[in-house]
Amino acid sequence: MGPCAAPPAFAQGKAADPRKPDPKAAQAPAPVRPSAVDKINDWGVYAAGAGKAKACYVLAEPKERAPKTLKRDPGYVFITQRPGEGVRNEVSVVMGFDVKPDSTPKAEIGAASFPMIAKGGNLWLKNPAQETDFVNALRKSPRLIVKADSLRGNTTTDTYALAGVGAALDRATKECQ
């Protein structure tokens, strides 16, 4: 509770009426909206928060999505840094659809293949210890290919262009120092 907020009624020895809102009760702060910092080729650089709560990330949308006939929400790949939490290069993918449970989604960068795990429509590297290897591979390759099976059994492929990803990651690192 901030220094200007009034303590809730129960802390003042009064019983609060649960049917009536307490106008003096502290309200939760509004969520912090990310700010666009830079755009390098297909990669946006964003930052949110301040101090130890600051987070920076790079984000891109796929250049190609297959099969083209499937209707789905937009997809994205994120690489996040949260220095205050000791997080660097956290990789996540939004597929735009729910991924089939117990399937084996994967990310391919050049000759390297990285197994992923799914929860709903989101993917993360199965082995977080590979995040640095994943990011180093991104810096050296022209494309990232993410493959996953939908709940309906469709195998989907999202292809991301990697031109500029290294500069975008460097910019995010600088922003989050």
PLM regions: where:
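Sec-dependent N-terminal signal peptides
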Residues: 1-12
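A generic "folded-domain core" signal
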Residues: 10-177
